[in-house]
UniProtKB/Swiss-Prot annotation:
This is Iron-sulfur cluster assembly protein CyaY. InterPro entries: CyaY (IPR047584), Frataxin/CyaY (IPR002908), Frataxin/CyaY_sf (IPR036524), Frataxin_CS (IPR020895). HAMAP family: CyaY. It comes from the Bacteria.
């Protein structure tokens, strides 16, 4: 994948996260906050915990930092998948956000 293709796909993923936060806030009382600075989004929860998603352009990866640990994702032609487990990024983001928010939250690719 070229750097340009990576950036297009990665930017689409970040936009989907931002849209997901807005949708979740409209549909639930989760009251999550998201702040984007360049290629990084910080998602903050009422309990003070955070998820951090950032782009790693040199590696063509997306990284997720959560209470449970750090995760690295590469695009496999269809989806962003964990480099160790093969799990899909938005499924993992949903699981980690749900754990940290204390209620079911769902993120999806745009």
């Amino acid at each position: 994948m070229t750097d340009s293709e990576y950036m297009d796909r990665a930017e689409a993923a970040l936009a989907a996260i931002e849209q997901g936060c807005d949708r979740i806030n409209d549909a639930t009382d989760a009251d999550i906050d998201n702040q984007r600075v360049g290629g990084m989004i910080t998602i903050s929860f009422k309990n003070g915990s955070q998820l951090i998603v950032n782009l790693q352009k040199p590696l063509q990866e997306i990284w997720l930092a959560a209470r449970s640990g750090g995760y690295h994702y590469r695009y496999d032609g269809k989806a962003w998948v964990d480099t160790k487990t093969g799990e899909e990024f938005f499924g993992n983001l949903s699981r980690e956000a749900s754990l940290q928010a204390g209620q079911p939250l769902e993120f999806a690719a745009a």
